[in-house]
Amino acid sequence: RMPVTLPQRVTKEMCDMLKKHHPLFINLQFNNPLEITEETKKACSMLADAGIPLGNQSVLLRGVNDDKFVMKRLNQGLLSCRVRPYYIFHAKGVVGTLHFRTSVDIGIEIMEHLRGYTSGLAIPTFIINAPKGKGKTPMLPEYVISHGRDTITIRTWEGTIIEYPNKDANVTYE
């Protein structure tokens, strides 16, 4: 969170030192588009100019970013700063932070909105970090409804149900 909360700590000297340790990848934690300021843009630019690929790992937080329009603005804003939205984590049930927790359904709704209304580059993966060390599990909207011999039935991001060819090459469709 340092480039977000204390961006002036990102200096030329720091970037020169980090350059010596390639490959180096840095994931940041922006949670709301209001955190994208002139100072954080400058810090991200300095890190990216040093050849460091930047990603972002947001935490889905009630009242902070649990709105599809807020999350879209955040992810599009990050791309403009050369930061690739990487993960949105569902908040864990940690004592003292439970009031920030949302339902998983809200996260899936946000992901469906992002899928339909922004660039694929601005779509992170929604993740539940499973309890007891069971690992990161992606939470994906269900788009495949059924599999047939020659077609699959799918739901588009708009909710339209269509049949799609499920054959080898040389199949045309409208």
Please name every model-derived segment:
Residues H22-L24, A50-P53, R82-R84, A122:
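Short, well-ordered coil/turn segments that N-cap beta-strands
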Residues M17, M46, G77-S80, H113:
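Alpha-helical scaffold elements within enzyme catalytic domains, especially in hydrolases
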Residues R9, D66-K68, L98-R101:
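Short, solvent-exposed loop/turn segments at secondary-structure boundaries
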Residues N65-L78:
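Catalytic cores of alpha/beta
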Residues L79-E174:
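Auxiliary Fe-S-binding modules of radical SAM enzymes
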Residues R1-V10, L18-E39, A43, P53-R62:
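Core AdoMet radical
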Residues T11, T40, M71, G107:
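Aromatic/hydrophobic pocket-lining residues that form the small-molecule binding cavity
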Residues T40-D67, W157-E174:
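Mobile, glycine- and charge-enriched loop segments
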